Amino acid sequence: MKETYQNLNSEINLWGPDGSLQLEKDKEAARAYFLEHVNPNTVFFHSLKEKTDYLIDNGLWSRDVVLRYGFDEFKRLMQHAYSFKFRFPTYLGAFKFYSSYALRNEDGTRYLERFEDRVVLTALAFSEDLEHAEYVITEIIEGRFQPATPTFLNAGRANAGGPVSCFILRVEDNMESISRMVTDSLQLSKRGGGVGISLTNIREAGSPIKKFEGQASGVIPIMKMLEDAFSYANQLGQRQGAGAVYLNAHHPDIMRFLDTKRENADEKIRIKTLSLGVVVPDITFDLARENRDMYLFSPYDVERVYGKPFSDISVTEHYNDLVNDERIRKTKINARKFFQTLAEIQFESGYPYIMFEDTVNRANPAPNVGRIISSNLCSEIMQPQVASTFKENGEFAEEGQDISCNLGSLNIAKMQQLANQDEFSHSVRVAYKFLNRVAKVTEMESSPSVVKGNNLARAIGLGQMNLHGWLISEGIPYDSEEAQERFRAYMHDVTYFLIGASIDQVQIDGRFGNYSGSRWEDGSLIDALAEESKKVNLEYSRVRSPFTEDLVDHWNGLKWEVKNDGMANQHLQAIPPTGSISYINNSTASIHPVTAPIEIRKEGKVGRVYYPAYGLTSENISEVKTAYEIGPEAIIDMYAVASPWVDQGLSLTLFFRDTATTRDINRAQVRAHKSGVKSIYYIRLVQKALTGTQVDECVSCML
């Protein structure tokens, strides 16, 4: 039998007697959910002191976090949080929080936290000081900033998982490196992060081992091993571990790699739960355009001849040399056939992700560290890595640099409601300081190369969500020039104030360890942003000063500050595919369009739940186009607007109608590459029969 709140929620999908949408029913559903479910199932305490003592003494809250500033200040922060009288505006937002985030008793039947409690513990765990903690509480409760799921879920809990969303490991062509990578993957997955891994350096199937020909097994057995490992590391049974493997398009195993995702693949090679990504250089597109063959190069021979791993070489730059070098074994396939196969697999499964290698490396803020060779589980984290070396006993000879990135997103609609430049800058800085604090205090001793990379880069990933919700509320079509102009100005402003915050943080934390030789130091990165600022419509920008005539002057001033002071962080932005946290925040996901004005979700035993898009009214619902109606071209163009401002990547999902063909997917791939977009995440087809495209997405990065 359905509860009252479920009935009320379902009524929002029905027209009322007066012919209008009954959107107010969703607020009634949220209220009924509290009265009928949350309140009766919440443990009652007579005082905050009683509650705090109970949760600390029973090993549920961390004493160090809760009492970081003393109990009196903890109480004051709690009073501050509850003073907002926060109410979830949607039933799904309330349901998501209490089903997935709120702390419960041991048998899971009763709640021990409310939303405000979780917010306060999050602020306490990752604030710079008491004043910043208060600011963080305000930003989260008023909906302008929301930390990612691992951070928000685990903050302040005793014996909980880690706060970091994403990790990326590189693996070299030796057993010691492979063994270490599997161990690290298990440990990082256990702590709640999604793990991306580059397999490009692994020698291909049939290559020699110790000069014995035909002995190597290639990448697929490693993929099978990783799939089992991530299934095993299921984070205390809460959710299955998650990983993604990336392979360069010019690796000899590339076609077998793609075949593992075919619906009719042999069970011996079929990969069911591991995500796949392909790293595609510029040269691959050039060869396809000219309808030429593309050569695949043996990583074993490349490393033997060049003295460095295959992934550390630009295939585009060295392609002709590699082709003409007789010492390097190679095979060839038709380049168009490769892209056709890529589209076929994406049509069937939604995979693989695509990372445009040369686009990404042209935007690399720290080429002095190394090349960017792969991405993460959601294709938005992109940082350079350094290989580790090992002794024969498996111990590190020298630790390299691997990647971690903590995430949080700004709500574009709420940010645009701020009255002036000072308020806008303040919100950006509060979010920045929070994420910077996560980077500083996170402990990952189980993976020394990740620790070293984090300490030297201090990378963060500030993201964005609710773009379409904001446009709906403003009456601006997603696929319009005005939408692009306004969004360009918004991303410009966020980037400008975010860089300023990192400059100021140098006074506290010093420059990030890899600063010397970076594009921050030589000024080329700021120069590129200054040039991009010429496209910004001044009418929409919040960057104002009576002393400068245009935005380029502002960027020149910022360049001077970086030159004098430096930067505290190697990376600042990444736009993830926000999921659960978008519902809690009453946002549309990430920066792509909605899939329906009123989204229908299936939530376990509860069944269907209805979620209206932010800004939706009876008057404008007929004007709201879905992602499938808008199509891939306009979505790619919007992501291209954001890409120059984001120093990492953006999770770009492409949506196609049921009439789409593999040729349409290929056209979208070419458009994305030409537009300067850095990666493609999932391919989604509207037809119901292709259930394989409705994949379980990355819980870690989906905020």
Question: Where are the model-predicted features located?
Answer:
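Internal maturation/activation junctions in enzymes
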Residues: 427-451, 459, 476-578
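Function-dense linear segments that define catalytic or interfacial modules
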Residues: 103-107, 115, 122-132, 137-164, ...
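A glycine-rich phosphate-binding loop feature that marks nucleotide/adenosyl-phosphate handling sites
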Residues: 139-140, 153-157, 199-205, 245-253, ...
